[in-house]
Amino acid sequence: MEIPEDLRYTREHEWARRKGSAIVVGITDFAQQQLGDVVYVELPDVGDPVKKGESFGVVESTKAVSELFAPISGKVIEVNDPLSDAPETINEDPYEEGWMITIEPSDPKDLEALMDAAAYKAFVEEQE
């Protein structure tokens, strides 16, 4: 299981990466492994507001339907539209090509409140 050091993580298994002043969001390798083959993803539209801890979309796999939760509050400024035609990208490359949305944060400090890689690794080990 891959847990990149440069990302921040949530207890709901989303990751967040700073990209300039924006935050890119996706689901972790652990999450995609638990889901199995992703067959559908529903994401918000550019311009939609998102609130930390609240649902911003849905991922459907052969095993389950899971909500996606925003790691920070802000406004969606970019959506990975190719995922609608190729949702399996989330399984193949969850941290790069499988990113989901980019958020312009209301408060950039929200990112610092998320778990670092070591804390997330410990959290996942408790879940297994």
Curated annotation (Swiss-Prot):
GO cellular component terms attached to this protein's record: cytosol; glycine cleavage complex
Residues where N6-lipoyllysine is found: 63
One matching Pfam family: GCV_H
Listed cofactors: (R)-lipoate
Cofactor comment text: Binds 1 lipoyl cofactor covalently.
Superkingdom classification of source: Bacteria
Keywords per UniProt: Lipoyl
Domain Lipoyl-binding, residue spans: 22-104
GO terms under biological process: glycine decarboxylation via glycine cleavage system
Physiological role: The glycine cleavage system catalyzes the degradation of glycine. The H protein shuttles the methylamine group of glycine from the P protein to the T protein.
Record's subunit section: The glycine cleavage system is composed of four proteins: P, T, L and H.
Matches recorded under NCBIfam families: gcvH, PRK01202.1
Similarity comment: Belongs to the GcvH family.
HAMAP family per UniProt: GcvH (MF_00272)
Protein name, UniProt field: Glycine cleavage system H protein
Origin species: Anaeromyxobacter sp. (strain K)
Organism phylogeny: Bacteria, Pseudomonadati, Myxococcota, Myxococcia, Myxococcales
